[in-house]
Amino acid sequence: KEDSRLPESILVQTVTGDYTKIHDQLVGPMDGDMMLQPDPDTMRLVPWASDPTGQIIHDCYTRDGELHPLASRNVLKRVLRLYEAEGWKPVVAPEVEYYLIQKNVDPEDELVPPIGRSGRREAGRQSYSIDAVNEFEPIVEEMYDFCEAQELDVDTLIHESGLAQMEINFLHGDALNLADQVFVFKRTMRE
């Protein structure tokens, strides 16, 4: 939509939802709106939705119509243009590490690993164990199904050293495309 907007302050929030101490220096005290422009190349299905649903990544623009300098996608595009000016094209293969946790509805409760198919929680390190990954086979299979439906180029999944800590590797490819895929993957894993 032409009138899609977000407040600039979203770009200076921390991972906890707080604002940086230099908020006003970065986006100004008025907290103006950015204009959002959808990138049709990022359109993907939402396979877990009960009704047919799509998702799309937007580029952020200032009120003057310029790419917003703080939007992470725009920062990456600037870096890629620097590479292009040198005649280079970066090829990347992201690795995303994350923890599986038991569903938790009370934010006061401690996060714990989920119960595996054996009926037990992990209690010790299971670095690179195939059996440890297999404990979570239902969620792993669903993850691969969701990734395939969204055309995410995921490859190898391994168990890392922490309790229920996983690492997924993406296939090598275009930096912007894979950054978008990682963004979608993170949302997918939260579902």
Predicted segments, located by residue:
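Short, hydrophobic beta-strand segments
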Residues: 56-62, 166-173
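Acidic, glycine-rich loop-and-beta core segments that form the ion-binding/anion-interacting portion
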Residues: 165, 178-191
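Short, conserved phosphate-binding/catalytic loop or strand-edge motifs used
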Residues: 96, 160-168
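Histidine-centered active-site/metal-ligand motif
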Residues: 158-159, 172
